[in-house]
């Protein structure tokens, strides 16, 4: 609006949505090995990438009930190595029981 009086021409009727700005910082720093040398920085980047690869993820495990042979599903949050260990256990001596068979 310009001036002391309101004019219809001064009123803006078209609203333009503002784009959302992501203010999240996705940077992760390793403070224990923080050093200004370039070699240490490249090592830190490699270590950080290795840590991110080993971070926990959500996995769904399906196995048969040892009593009624129905499918039992587990959702686990674990590293890839630990999921492999669970897989080896389920292929060996460990068996899962479904909810219905467990209540008898």
Swiss-Prot record:
Pfam family, one: E7
Span(s) of short sequence motif LXCXE motif: 23-27
Top-level lineage group: Viruses
Signal sequence annotation: none
Motif (Nuclear export signal): 83-91
Alphabetized Gene3D superfamilies for the sequence: 3.30.160.330
Listed InterPro entries: Papilloma_E7 (IPR000148)
Keyword Zinc-finger carried by entry: yes
GO MF term set: DNA binding; DNA-binding transcription factor activity; protein domain specific binding; zinc ion binding
Subcellular location, record wording: Host cytoplasm; Host nucleus
GO cellular component, one term: host cell cytoplasm
Zinc fingers (unnamed) by residue: 65-101
GO BP terms: DNA-templated transcription; symbiont-mediated perturbation of host cell cycle G1/S transition checkpoint; symbiont-mediated suppression of host innate immune response; symbiont-mediated suppression of host type I interferon-mediated signaling pathway
Main location: host cell
Keywords: Activator, DNA-binding, Early protein, G1/S host cell cycle checkpoint dysregulation by virus, Host cytoplasm, Host nucleus, Host-virus interaction, Inhibition of host innate immune response by virus, Inhibition of host interferon signaling pathway by virus, Interferon antiviral system evasion, Metal-binding, Modulation of host cell cycle by virus, Oncogene, Transcription, Transcription regulation, Viral immunoevasion, Zinc, Zinc-finger
PTM annotation, UniProt: Highly phosphorylated.
Family membership noted in the UniProt record: Belongs to the papillomaviridae E7 protein family.
Quaternary organization: Homodimer. Homooligomer. Interacts with host RB1; this interaction induces dissociation of RB1-E2F1 complex thereby disrupting RB1 activity. Interacts with host EP300; this interaction represses EP300 transcriptional activity. Interacts with protein E2; this interaction inhibits E7 oncogenic activity. Interacts with host TMEM173/STING; this interaction impairs the ability of TMEM173/STING to sense cytosolic DNA and promote the production of type I interferon (IFN-alpha and IFN-beta).
Role description: Plays a role in viral genome replication by driving entry of quiescent cells into the cell cycle. Stimulation of progression from G1 to S phase allows the virus to efficiently use the cellular DNA replicating machinery to achieve viral genome replication. E7 protein has both transforming and trans-activating activities. Induces the disassembly of the E2F1 transcription factor from RB1, with subsequent transcriptional activation of E2F1-regulated S-phase genes. Interferes with host histone deacetylation mediated by HDAC1 and HDAC2, leading to transcription activation.
Name assigned to this protein: Protein E7
Gene assigned in the entry: E7
């Amino acid at each position: 609006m310009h001036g002391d009086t309101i004019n219809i021409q001064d009123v803006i009727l078209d609203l333009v949505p503002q784009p959302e700005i992501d203010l999240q910082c996705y940077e992760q720093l390793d403070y224990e090995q923080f050093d200004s040398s370039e070699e240490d920085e490249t090592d830190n980047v490699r270590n950080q990438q290795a840590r991110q690869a080993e971070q926990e993820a959500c996995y769904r495990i399906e196995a048969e009930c040892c009593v009624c042979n129905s499918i039992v599903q587990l959702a686990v949050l674990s590293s890839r190595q630990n999921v492999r260990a669970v897989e080896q256990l389920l292929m060996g001596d460990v068996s899962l029981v479904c909810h219905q068979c467990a209540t008898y």
